[in-house]
Regions:
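N-terminal, membrane-interfacial amphipathic/helix-forming hydrophobic leader that caps
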Residues: 1-77, 218-296
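Hydrophobic alpha-helical transmembrane segments
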Residues: 4-11, 52-53, 90-95, 125-129, ...
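Transmembrane alpha-helical core residues of multi-pass small-molecule transporters
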Residues: 13-14, 58, 167-168, 185, ...
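Juxtamembrane helix-loop-helix connectors linking adjacent transmembrane helices
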Residues: 26-51, 71-141, 148-153, 281, ...
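Membrane-embedded alpha-helical segments of multi-pass membrane proteins
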Residues: 56-64, 125-130, 138, 142, ...
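Small-polar-interrupted transmembrane alpha-helices in polytopic inner-membrane proteins
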Residues: 98-104, 132, 136, 157-173, ...
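Membrane-interface helix/loop boundary segments of multi-pass membrane proteins
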Residues: 138-163, 167, 195-202
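Functionally important transmembrane alpha-helices
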Residues: 182-242
Length: 296
């Protein structure tokens, strides 16, 4: 089947399965069914149980759609399952994500007058860790494991990176306070995640990075995460008391993030031009490690 037909088939299935699983959420929290967007955003920000069940529903909807397309069309299981939860890959991604977030915060502190307030440890961070891990796994499975891998099989590598990253960015278009800088930065993050995936054919690396990026940005340092508000252990604020220009969407809405992410993209591209190990195909359902070759 043509890759575009497969992708166009995937999204309606993703919506269908997500709605079906979300029906359970509506049964448990009937008030969410008729809530306005503002009321819904408030419910997600204040009700941890609702937030967790909602993410589980989306997680199940995403994987149901991926498995349906893979089993019915490709007749095989999704390839990324082989590398999705490798401990060493997750750890590497977590550390790399932490480095980037800390670098962004360091530059922010050096270029603006900031103050850090300690709010104290909140047990809710453990719940947020579960939620952000579910988000990282489901979004990476969809964006890199399914969409990018299938595009890469039937088109140019760079075209595949650009298109899958654009789709990844647009997936966040309905988030609160979404703006063009946020769209650009999520697009750039998508490119970087594709690079990480190609570097070792290991989806656990971008999953670890994605998880670390969100967890540190929100529940640790107190910024919004792609427009989603959380209570942080720390709170980094403008010393004058005024809000940062990017505050509504989070660090992903800042030009500092644009510069840092762009630097890492260029650095990874230059240092790996002759070192990245690529396969001739990223099989949608199985990766033949023996087929890996060095890219010239």
């Amino acid at each position: 089947m043509n890759i575009w037909t497969k992708i166009l088939l995937f999204f309606p299935l993703w919506l269908l399965f997500s709605v079906l699983f979300y029906g359970i959420v509506f049964l448990i929290y009937p008030e969410s069914y008729s809530a306005s967007k503002t009321e819904f955003d408030t419910l997600i920000s204040t009700n941890y149980g609702f937030l967790l069940i909602s993410q589980v529903a989306l997680f199940l909807g995403t994987f149901s759609a991926i498995f349906f397309v893979s089993k019915v069309i490709d007749k095989q299981k999704p390839a990324f399952l082989n590398s999705m939860l490798k401990p060493e890959g997750l750890l590497f991604g977590v550390v790399l994500g932490a480095i980037e977030i800390l670098l962004i915060i360091l530059i922010l502190s050096l270029t603006t007058k900031t103050k850090i307030t300690f709010h104290g440890f909140n047990i809710s961070i453990l719940l947020y860790a579960i939620i952000f891990f579910l988000i990282a796994v489901s979004e990476e499975a969809m964006s890199r494991g399914f969409i990018f891998a299938n595009l890469y099989n039937q088109s140019n590598k760079y075209f595949s990176i650009i298109i899958s990253s654009l789709i990844f960015s647009l997936m966040h278009a309905f988030n609160s306070s979404f703006n063009w800088i946020g769209m650009l930065n999520i697009f750039l993050i998508g490119i970087f995640f594709c690079q990480l995936y190609l570097k070792r054919m290991n989806l656990s690396i971008p999953i670890g990075f994605h998880f670390s990026w969100n967890l540190l940005q929100g529940p640790v340092f107190g910024f919004s995460v792609s427009g989603f508000t959380t209570q942080g252990i720390l709170k980094i604020e403008n010393f004058s008391g005024s809000k940062f220009p990017f505050e509504g969407f989070g660090l992903e809405g800042s030009l500092i993030s644009t510069l840092v992410i762009s630097f890492f993209i260029v650095y990874l591209y230059i240092t790996n031009t002759r070192k990245i190990m690529l396969s001739e195909k990223i099989e949608p359902s199985s990766i033949n490690v023996a087929a890996l070759k060095a890219e010239a």
